[in-house]
């Protein structure tokens, strides 16, 4: 039985987040107000900056392509063809906000199904309400949670396909392959892991390969930007830089500490007395990668 209180929380958080972004919506997303009021969003910014307002294909430019993987890029390209009228930027945001709320609500119910004890932790997390519409992260969160749900149901083929969708949406879900590999290894299901990985790879390539072939520079721009980015808001390294700590070699530190975190996670998962579920350890793989990353 679905709790009315839970539904109320989901709708209330969605409303609060919309309220937070409403100042920018009312002022046409102008700067510096979007930063002062903490309502900046890539959704509005990239609509015109990446020429979606003219229905331009998001990966046709080598220098101004859409800096997100294909599912987000193609999805927003399709949205741009809707008859948005004179107030197109706000309607573009509204359509995206509606989709994000749908993904948020469904993913919250999936978390409840995976483990009811933690159902409220996800929607009530301050970072969720504060940044619900800052970009399209809920698209990938939705597919990641579905990946976990079906994996722990032993429906590996569906889970592998969904992981391919998740990686083609934001790429960082590739870190799930680490705990998945260890779970299969512990269960002596090596061939099942190979099949799982092939399903994931085929779906990823289905979305990426055509664009990479015909618009390689535009497709590669997402990876190029992430490889070249410095320490940004939310990362440990940016916080340390505010303390006037010399971080000339922070890229090397980031790589070394990330590899150490991954190595420790592998040892930890292998030495566990019993095989964990993906729901129990997926978070650890994300933490191992994001804690020392240049961008959080």
Where are these regions (language model features)?
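TM-lumen/periplasm interface segments of multi-pass membrane proteins
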Residues: 1-115, 227
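Specific aromatic-rich, kink-prone transmembrane helix
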Residues: 140-156
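Short acidic/glycine- and proline-prone juxtamembrane loop motifs at membrane-interface regions
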Residues: 132-140
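Extracytoplasmic catalytic-loop and juxtamembrane helix elements of membrane-embedded
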Residues: 29-38, 211-241
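Perimembrane helix-loop-helix junctions
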Residues: 1, 175-202
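Aromatic/glycine/proline-enriched transmembrane-helix motif characteristic
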Residues: 105, 230-295
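Membrane-interface alpha helices of multi-pass inner-membrane proteins
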Residues: 127-130, 146-147, 157-181, 283-291
């Amino acid at each position: 039985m679905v709790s009315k209180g839970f539904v109320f929380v989901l709708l209330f958080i969605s409303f609060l987040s919309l309220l937070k972004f409403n100042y920018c919506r009312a002022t046409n997303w102008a700067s510096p107000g979007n930063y002062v009021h903490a309502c900046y969003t890539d959704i509005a910014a990239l609509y015109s900056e990446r020429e979606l307002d003219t229905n331009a294909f998001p990966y046709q430019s080598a220098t101004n392509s859409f800096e997100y993987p294909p599912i987000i890029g193609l999805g927003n390209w399709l949205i741009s063809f809707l008859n948005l009228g004179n107030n197109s930027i706000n309607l573009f945001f509204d359509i995206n906000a509606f989709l994000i709320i749908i993904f948020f609500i469904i993913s919250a119910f999936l978390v409840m199904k995976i483990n009811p004890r933690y159902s409220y932790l996800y929607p009530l997390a301050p970072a969720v309400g504060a940044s619900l519409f800052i970009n399209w992260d809920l698209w990938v969160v939705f597919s990641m949670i579905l990946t976990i749900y079906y994996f722990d149901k032993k429906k590996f083929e569906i889970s592998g396909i969904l992981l391919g969708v998740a990686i083609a949406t934001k790429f960082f879900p590739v870190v799930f392959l680490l705990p998945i590999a260890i779970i299969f290894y512990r269960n002596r299901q090596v061939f099942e892991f190979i099949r799982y990985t092939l399903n994931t790879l085929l779906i990823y390539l289905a979305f990426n390969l055509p664009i990479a072939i015909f618009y390689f520079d535009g497709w590669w721009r997402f990876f190029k930007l992430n490889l070249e980015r410095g320490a940004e808001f939310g990362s440990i390294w940016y916080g340390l830089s505010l303390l006037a700590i010399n971080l000339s070699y922070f890229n090397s530190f980031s790589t070394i500490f990330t590899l150490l975190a991954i190595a420790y996670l592998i040892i930890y998962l292998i030495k566990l007395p019993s095989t964990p579920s993906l729901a129990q350890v997926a978070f650890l793989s994300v933490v191992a990668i994001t804690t020392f990353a240049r961008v959080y």
